[in-house]
Amino acid sequence: VGYRPPPMFQIIFNEISAAEMSALPTELQLDLLAQFQILPEELDNLDPERFGRIVRDGSVLHRYRAGDYRIYFERAEEGIQIHRVLHKNTVRDFLYRSKLPMVEEDRSLAAKPGFWQLIDEGERARAPH
């Protein structure tokens, strides 16, 4: 009965989210990843102060607030799939252009097809090579 390491899982970036992340300064990338401490089994009981939950057609997309950035992700078989890494002003600009109230950001986003188009674009992107 020796030491058992925790089960391995991956944080998977698609082509778009990888490009969004790599466009950031290296120190900021490391800081965001250090803040993004989560295991797939924790997705059912996330702290609502740190995580948002956006539902569409039975699918659940999560939002993590890391400083001035928002990481949109979901549970995947291999671990956690990152769909987008956006500066908060990008989301706010989207909300402003959509004429949505800033309160209840997640519910407002879930109701707007343009937001899902942004996420779907990330989902369809191939993982970087």
Where are these regions (language model features)?
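Residues that form generic nucleotide/phosphate-binding pockets
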Residues: 20, 35, 118
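N-terminal "first-domain core" detector
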Residues: 7-16
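Surface-exposed, Lys/Arg-rich phosphate-binding patches that contact polyanionic backbones
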Residues: 19-27
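A short, surface-exposed loop/turn module that caps and links secondary-structure elements
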Residues: 38-65
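Enriched for short, Lys/Arg-rich terminal
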Residues: 2-7, 66-70, 74-129
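Negatively charged, low-complexity tracts enriched in Asp/Glu with abundant Ser/Thr
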Residues: 26, 30, 34-38
